[in-house]
């Protein structure tokens, strides 16, 4: 099935754009949502995380203590790799399972770290980047998540640069000051193009 990899930095508006594609009938497979699901109470990753990192990283409800884990992986590169060794295979497995059952004309994979991963670029037919400048990212995330500026800057620094994302893009949606209506119009135009690509891929 024809597939699009949708990516962008934190706070760029990936979820808003993905929701617009979903309303038009595309199948959305969001790796962030899958990551949250496997680290929720009774999530597939939780027994492995508890065994690897200890019970102190499990919240009272049985989910991942995200704040504690975030602090650890930002200060300890080996801890980040140990966490990813647990979560990434499970995310891949769930991602492929959802893609196999897709009912839409094409699939949009929402992958925040698509450019960084190295493998996703060859997994999808087109890469769509939702782009905005770093100051816009910082303003959105501090307002949305309650993070400090320094916390957001640290997250941005660990992600691919804006230039690297744009270099990997087949399509770009600029989302610094776009209204939802403007985004919807851009998504609708891309949707028509992707429908044509999906039809050509089936023939």
Swiss-Prot record:
Domain DPCK: 3-201
E.C. numbers: 2.7.1.24
CDD domains on file: DPCK (cd02022)
Listed pathway(s): Cofactor biosynthesis; coenzyme A biosynthesis; CoA from (R)-pantothenate: step 5/5
Keywords: ATP-binding, Coenzyme A biosynthesis, Cytoplasm, Kinase, Nucleotide-binding, Transferase
UniProt main location, coarse: cytoplasm
Binding sites annotated in the UniProt record for ATP: 11-16
Catalysed reactions listed for this entry: 3'-dephospho-CoA + ATP = ADP + CoA + H(+)
Location within or outside the cell: Cytoplasm
Superkingdom of origin: Bacteria
One Gene Ontology term, aspect cellular component: cytoplasm
Enzymatic class: transferase
Function: Catalyzes the phosphorylation of the 3'-hydroxyl group of dephosphocoenzyme A to form coenzyme A.
Protein name, as recorded: Dephospho-CoA kinase
Gene: coaE
């Amino acid at each position: 099935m024809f597939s699009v990899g949708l990516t962008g930095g934190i706070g760029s508006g990936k979820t808003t754009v993905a929701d617009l594609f979903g309303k038009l009938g595309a199948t959305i497979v969001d790796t962030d949502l899958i990551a949250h699901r496997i680290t929720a109470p009774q999530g597939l990753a939780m027994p492995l995380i508890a065994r690897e990192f200890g019970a102190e990283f499990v919240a009272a409800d049985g989910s991942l203590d995200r704040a504690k884990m975030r602090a650890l992986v930002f200060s300890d590169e080996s801890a980040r790799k140990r966490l990813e060794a647990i979560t990434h295979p499970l995310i891949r497995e769930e991602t492929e399972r959802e893609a196999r059952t897709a009912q839409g004309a094409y699939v949009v994979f929402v992958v925040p770290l698509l450019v960084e991963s190295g493998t996703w670029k060859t997994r999808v037919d087109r890469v769509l980047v939702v782009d905005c400048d770093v100051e816009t990212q910082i303003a959105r995330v501090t307002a949305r998540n309650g993070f400090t500026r320094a916390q957001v800057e640290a997250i941005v620094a660990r992600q691919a640069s804006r230039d690297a994302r744009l270099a990997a893009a087949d399509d770009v949606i600029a989302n610094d000051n776009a209204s939802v209506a403007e985004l919807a119009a851009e998504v609708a135009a891309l949707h028509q193009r992707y429908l044509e690509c999906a039809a050509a891929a089936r023939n």
